[in-house]
């Protein structure tokens, strides 16, 4: 389901995202974009922005987020206003069925999407986009309808710049669910064959 993410885990994700990227923060006019597809109250975006500013206080960091829960969305948008950012970068809606950032590409993506939640509500829109092939986000395959977390991963991959990095939290089922040739298996094959997986970090129970 939807989960609160501790600051320790967010800072670990932030550090992993920028590891080896220090050279990108030398010189003037540094500009970076950060996206969270299930931003909640936007704490991941805030922590990532803080981390990038530690690397270069003068860097122009622009954050973007989408959230389906109206309560947490309101908090995220208010926080953006308080911090002097652009509230229009905070969008309300279901990321899977109503993508508010279609066509966008980001430097960094950080997210803790819900897992173990069916995507039956979004089935019509997701299936239609899958049929578009590479013109959509879900061309590699569709997971079992009982768990949509791999759809969020595909959404993130579709929004990365060529040199972009993504840190995303998933439960263990993403590693082994589905027989060979099934949707989940094809998604994993897509990741491996394109060399898009740098690391898997197993978090402790109840982290």
Model regions and ranges:
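Conserved S-adenosyl-L-methionine
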Residues: 2-111, 115-127, 170-173, 180-187, ...
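Aromatic-residue hotspot detector
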Residues: 44, 68, 130, 138-142, ...
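Short beta-alpha connecting loops at secondary-structure transitions
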Residues: 61-64, 136-140, 203
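Conserved catalytic motifs of ABC-family nucleotide-binding domains
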Residues: 115-118, 122-146
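Conserved Class I SAM-dependent methyltransferase catalytic core
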Residues: 142-206
């Amino acid at each position: 389901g939807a989960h609160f993410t501790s600051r320790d885990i967010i800072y670990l994700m932030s550090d992993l995202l920028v590891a080896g990227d220090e050279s990108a923060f030398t010189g003037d006019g540094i500009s970076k974009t950060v996206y969270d597809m299930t931003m909640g109250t936007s704490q991941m975006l805030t922590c990532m922005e803080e981390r990038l500013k530690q690397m270069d206080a003068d860097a122009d960091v622009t954050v973007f987020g989408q959230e389906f829960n109206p309560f947490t969305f309101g908090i995220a948008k208010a926080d953006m206003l308080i911090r002097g950012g652009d509230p229009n970068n905070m969008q309300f809606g279901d990321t899977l069925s109503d993508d508010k950032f279609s066509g966008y590409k980001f430097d960094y993506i950080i997210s803790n999407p819900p897992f173990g939640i069916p995507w039956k509500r979004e089935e019509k829109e997701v299936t239609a986009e899958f049929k578009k092939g590479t013109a959509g986000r879900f061309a590699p395959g569709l997971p079992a309808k009982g768990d949509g977390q791999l759809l969020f991963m595909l959404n993130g991959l579709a929004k990365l710049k060529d040199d972009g990095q993504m840190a995303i939290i998933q439960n263990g089922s993403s590693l082994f669910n589905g027989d060979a040739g099934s949707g989940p298996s094809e998604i994993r094959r897509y990741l491996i064959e394109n060399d898009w997986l740098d690391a898997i970090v197993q978090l402790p129970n109840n982290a």
